[in-house]
Amino acid sequence: MRCSQREVFVKREEPTNPEWGKPPSQRTADEYIRHSFVILDKPRGPSSHEVAAWVKKILGVERAGHAGTLDPKVSGVLPIAVAEGTKVLMALSRSDKVYVAVAKFHGDVDEERLRAVLREFQGEIYQKPPLRSAVKRQLRTRRVFSLELLELEGRYAVIKMHVEAGTYARKIIHDIGEVLGVGANMRELRRVAVTCFTEDEAVTLQDVADAYYIWKKYGDDTYLRSVLLPIEEIARHLPKIWVRDSAVDAVCHGAPLAAPGISKFEVPFSKGDIVAMFTLKGELVGIGRALVDSEEVKKMERGAVVRTDRVVMRRGTYPAMWKKGQRAAKT
């Protein structure tokens, strides 16, 4: 998957004061680590929690968190945020996923019939989580964007599936087997993408360890900066809103982002969408939910535009130019 390119609507041209904040590329190595995340290629065997704990230990930070749990037997793309970056993991909470599964059918299947059944499973489907699940087992709907047969050999099939967050790939394979009348089970599963973060840019635990060692031993952070991504990248797939210097600290204290505090923004977005708020230097301030759609923002001169849900920027990075008294978001 690729992130779609959005147009930028300029509400008001605004300079940024170089005395406040700094572009992400100018952060020191320590600052960079604390405001970073990594697209990890999780191996089969350990749990997602164990892998995140290893990243935390390697980088010497107090916390690390992952988005989109992978079972121990599943490999592939696992985004892990570090230190301050964990505050905005919800940016990936509703992200769609792409998997490649190896299915074994319990009887012979016709290729054309299989392709036809795969087409039937595209769109809205009903699913009940499997018995061994961390969530309540109640019927729910999930969207399947595409199912593609990559290979069929004997009773084994390789199927690529692009699905909504929270979809159980194993259950899809089981249900396909039921519709075909032969039964099926999943033999192997790999996640190849989380939204527009793909396995092509994923790194291994060894890469993370090597990059950190080279920086500590030789003072060269070049490899470190290629293995870890700046936390700003976690919002790659989200609509972006650039905040005027005068409004940044209010958002850092949890205030809603109001129309006068906006310099420019990407279009389109709808009411209720998760959006990312950036400084004019390109620093991620936080994320929240749009209270209005982008077309309305174009005309607004006052009023709240974004409800601030999570803040990653430290308070006081930009000077306070606002009236206190508004409720703070979680930081």
From Swiss-Prot:
Protein name: Probable tRNA pseudouridine synthase B
Compositional bias annotation for Basic and acidic residues: 1-15
Protein role: Could be responsible for synthesis of pseudouridine from uracil-55 in the psi GC loop of transfer RNAs.
Matches recorded under PANTHER family: CENTROMERE/MICROTUBULE BINDING PROTEIN CBF5, H_ACA RIBONUCLEOPROTEIN COMPLEX SUBUNIT DKC1
InterPro entries: Dyskerin-like, PsdUridine_synth_cat_dom_sf, PsdUridine_synth_N, PUA, PUA-like_sf, PUA_sf, tRNA_PsdUridine_synth_B_fam, TruB_arch
Family: Belongs to the pseudouridine synthase TruB family. Type 2 subfamily.
Primary enzyme class: isomerase
Domain of life of the source: Archaea
NCBIfam families per UniProt: CBF5 (TIGR00425), PRK04270.1 (NF003280), unchar_dom_2 (TIGR00451)
